[in-house]
Amino acid sequence: AKDGYLVNKSTGCKYECFWLGKNEFCDKECKAKNQGGSYGYCYSFACWCEGLPESTSTYPLPNKSCGRK
């Protein structure tokens, strides 16, 4: 397993969050079937996820940097 920032595969951006620490949105996104993590929380205004499978992409994506085309 690995830890990392969740990443939007279509934009290459992190999942933004504003409620730091325990965060329902991040936890839900982290545990979603397509991510497969064990616990998510908000760190530095982005969703950090623990216990991700190695197959799940995390920020930064190799071919996409957020905000650049």
Swiss-Prot record:
Disulfide topology: 13-66, 17-42, 26-47, 30-49
Residue ranges of the propeptide: 67-69
Keyword field: Amidation, Disulfide bond, Ion channel impairing toxin, Neurotoxin, Secreted, Signal, Toxin, Voltage-gated sodium channel impairing toxin
Compartments, record wording: Secreted
GO molecular function: sodium channel inhibitor activity; toxin activity
Modified residues (Cysteine amide): 66
GO cellular component: extracellular region
Biological process, per Gene Ontology: defense response
Gene3D superfamilies (alphabetical): Knottin, scorpion toxin-like (3.30.30.10)
Domain notes: Has the structural arrangement of an alpha-helix connected to antiparallel beta-sheets by disulfide bonds (CS-alpha/beta).
Stated role: Beta toxins bind voltage-independently at site-4 of sodium channels (Nav) and shift the voltage of activation toward more negative potentials thereby affecting sodium channel activation and promoting spontaneous and repetitive firing.
Protein name listed in UniProt: Neurotoxin Cex3
Organism, scientific name: Centruroides exilicauda
